[in-house]
Amino acid sequence: MYKALITCVYTNSYTYYCRFGMRSVIAEAHFDGSRNFIVLLGGLRRYILTHPDQCVNMHMYPRGHPSGRHSAIDWSKPDPVEFPNWLKLRGNEVIMQPGDLLYLPTYWIHYIISLNVNYQCNTRSGRTSHYDEDIKKCGF
């Protein structure tokens, strides 16, 4: 049973991932280069979402860096002296509960905090070019 939850299934161009989280586990702020559909199957997860035009305020690691696509800011303890644009950053927050589905468009930046033991599955499905100009301003 558990093996089916943690393996990837490849069907045409769609890939399904299932992830488990424990309380306080964090996925650092980053963007994906494709559309992402996320369903929470159990537990609670907090997502902080920002429009791609906010990448200029996020001190993103550059293309080619091992952490490219990720923010250099520690969002759990941001330092506005080191990262002054942090204070300009605008975003939205959602607390996902079991059965919730979240759609992340291409390049939307997200920071994820597990609020308790939880599990989710997601699929990435192609990309859109709607936010290409926004993300290009940050060198991507």
Feature locations, PLM:
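N-terminal accessory scaffold of Fe(II)-dependent oxygenases
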Residues: 1-101, 109-140
